[in-house]
């Protein structure tokens, strides 16, 4: 059984009070790329988490970037994950992991090895569909948003599709699995802005920066289902 890191201490999930109900508790999360045992954009992930913690719960955290980086490297080693490339999930529990807890706690899990050693652009024509489902505190990486994205994915797969773009009650496409959805028309790339409910992420910042470096005009505008029918390409990013 893989170990996890709870508040800096390495433990087996079976030793936690109730590992399944724990993940149903309110929490914030980040999926983190690691290359060679390190997380190159860890500061961005921690910035997003601390901002969400402050805005949603009015709380501050003293998460140390150097300590979290050390715990990630050690956890990958303990669980014998390949150093080349892996995905790690960092969860922040503002109300604690157990019912009786009264402090903010964090959990680090090794998720899965990744196929590629670095970021890779690849082209695969996957079937995309949309699902209308609003999450509480839209625009933040919450457990509620995670459940809504999973619901959308299962719904689309039952329809025979592969990717689910989640749509809010106003008909705005928020993203795919918590990551940005972009549509490309000519030399223009459009994506839903954070102010319209899209979620900030390290991958979002990277892909928008890459588009600008390639000379594309990046426009943040609320995407709709109808816009998918008129674009040249639709693309998203994933920790894989």
Regions found by a protein language model. Give the residues of each.
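Helix-start/capping segments and mature chain N-termini
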Residues: 1-74, 95-240
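Ordered, amphipathic secondary-structure segments that act as subunit-interaction surfaces
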Residues: 81-92
């Amino acid at each position: 059984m893989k170990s996890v890191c709870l508040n800096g201490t390495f433990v087996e999930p079976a030793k936690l009070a109730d590992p399944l109900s724990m993940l149903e508790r309110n929490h914030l999360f980040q999926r983190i790329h690691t290359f060679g045992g390190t997380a190159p954009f860890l500061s961005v992930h921690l910035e997003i988490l601390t901002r969400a913690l402050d805005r949603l719960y009015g709380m501050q955290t003293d998460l140390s970037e150097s300590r979290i980086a050390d715990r990630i490297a050690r956890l990958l080693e303990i669980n014998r994950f390949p150093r080349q490339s892996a995905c790690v999930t960092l969860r922040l529990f503002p109300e604690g992991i157990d019912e009786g807890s009264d402090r903010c706690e964090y959990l680090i899990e090794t998720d899965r090895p990744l196929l590629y050693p670095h970021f890779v652009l690849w082209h695969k024509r996957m079937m995309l569909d949309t699902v209308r489902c609003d999450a509480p505190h839209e625009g933040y990486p919450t457990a509620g948003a995670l459940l809504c994205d999973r619901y959308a994915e299962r719904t689309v797969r039952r329809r025979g599709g592969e990717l689910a773009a989640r749509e809010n009650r106003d008909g705005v496409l928020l993203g795919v699995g918590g990551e940005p959805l972009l549509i490309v028309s000519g030399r223009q790339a459009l994506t839903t802005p954070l102010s319209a409910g899209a979620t900030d992420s390290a991958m979002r910042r990277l892909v928008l920066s890459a588009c600008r470096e390639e000379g594309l005009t990046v426009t943040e505008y609320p995407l709709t289902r109808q816009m998918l029918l008129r674009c040249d390409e639709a693309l998203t990013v994933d920790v894989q």
